């Protein structure tokens, strides 16, 4: 009986040691600099963590270094921050360049769609073959996802379509003027376009790629150096816990009031209808999957990009992910 009791106590101790532990009163907070986008969904998650003190709950104090997405992704490589928001495809490029990155927690799905005018005759993405389409630059994750979707439909994004590269605002203007038939667009801009009554979604990237690969494409994760992950496991656990709490709040709708307070600043949503639609879309785009099955789905998406020549071959893609 005593032996069984000792085994039970040991089991409880081991279980507790694997769980994130909230900080005790008076315990010093460990500073963590994280590069992230100042606006949009990545910026929103960062603001939510700060506002709700989800970081200090686990003994860390996150300072968000606001940058554009490309700059943020390279901040760890340049030694400017300990961690950074980045796309898995960016992590692949960083590993190839000699910066050994590990992804530790999910943030958001792609949220991208092919958007057309409401009265456009197109019923499928394939119907756009040979047409002018507005797309992001070839080096972006948004372009990467569009190329993978085309490949899976036995099309070539570069050969079968007339790509017109542009930034967000210019893409919307191109569609408004009728200079392209469709644009690759992301949230919250897609929501605002659809809410105007003039446009519709032709193809949702997240739905399409989940149907093909078993999970939506991850647009943003938190990346750290392999050395940091190996030497500071408690810190990694704390960062993951803060982000997991934020994602849980979003998925369960507990951030309703906070979203409304940030809708204009971070998403440029103004009317009650836009805010309501944006809230639902933000909830849907919060990424809450992790683990082996999820990693395999993302690896297949990345491998498709490698086959297209959009990404370098770095060997075993499983090494990117921290379970």
Predicted regions and their residues:
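Short, glycine-/small- and polar/acidic-enriched structural segments
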Residues: 26-165, 174, 181-187, 202
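Hinge/cleft segment of the Venus flytrap/periplasmic-binding protein
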Residues: 310-323
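Sec/Tat signal peptide C-region and signal peptidase I cleavage site
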Residues: 19-25
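Positively charged n-region of N-terminal signal peptides that target proteins for export
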Residues: 1-7
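Pocket-lining segment of extracytoplasmic ligand-binding domains
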Residues: 89-90, 164, 169-263
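Short, solvent-exposed loop/beta-turn-alpha elements that line the ligand-binding surface or hinge
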Residues: 53, 57, 207-215, 284-293
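Bacterial N-terminal signal peptides
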Residues: 7-17
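Secondary-structure end/capping motifs
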Residues: 229-310
